[in-house]
Amino acid sequence: MGKVDDNKKLKMNTLLQTAFDLFTGKGFAKTTVSDIVNQAGLAKGTFYLYFKDKYDLRDKLIAYKACQLFDDAHKQLEETEINSLEEEILFLTDYIIDRFQKQQSLLKFLSKNLSWGVFQDAVGTGSVVSRQFYDHYRNSLVKYNVNCENPDLLLFTLIELISSTSYNCILHEKPVSMEEYKPYLHKSLKKVYEVFVLSLIHI
């Protein structure tokens, strides 16, 4: 049973990665289901076991790639000495931006789709990756004794701010380059954090 599940997961991941390569290289509109299965070396029937059509695949791929990004960021965070939730937020921001700068195809694909909606859907559907990231965030609120009235709204604001501002700064250096903009982004994130965090709980 384990081998069967592993094989299914392998096939789905192969389809997702192949689709990502084609969507970012050839373009979504010009890519067909036949293109995807042929390059993946799988039968068309296998495709329809996992996805309704290429639009369904694209939506799942956005969540899949976003989850990978959150998972990698979480792993890096676990290896770093951090002393506050605010420091965690800035560390994760820099990690995500650095990945986008190195993998601009990922940035172009996710574009403004790295949103709260995608993240929330992934968590809600039981994605282990997103769940771990989200649970870590909620645990950090407790760990650092942070009193936040609406943690989900804080996370939503942070994700939306980072994703909406990084695209043009990285790809087009407009209105300025990402390196020039980053200090202002950090200050903005700190202010957002201050607005949502009511006070520290002293134990």
Where do the protein language model's features map onto the residues?
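Hydrophobic alpha-helical connector segments
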Residues: K60, K75-K102, L155-L158
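Helix-turn-helix
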Residues: T14, L22-D56, K60
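Short secondary-structure transition hinges
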Residues: D98-D135, L171
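N-terminal positioning helix adjacent to the helix-turn-helix/winged-helix DNA-binding module
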Residues: V4, L10-T14, T18
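Hydrophobic alpha-helical segments that form the core
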Residues: C148-L171, E180-V192
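Amphipathic alpha-helical packing segments from all-alpha helical-bundle domains
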Residues: C67, D71, V118-N145, D152-F156, ...
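Hydrophobic/aromatic residues within well-ordered alpha-helical segments
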Residues: K11, K54, K65-L69, L92, ...
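Conserved small/polar residues in nucleotide/adenosyl-binding loops
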Residues: I201-I203
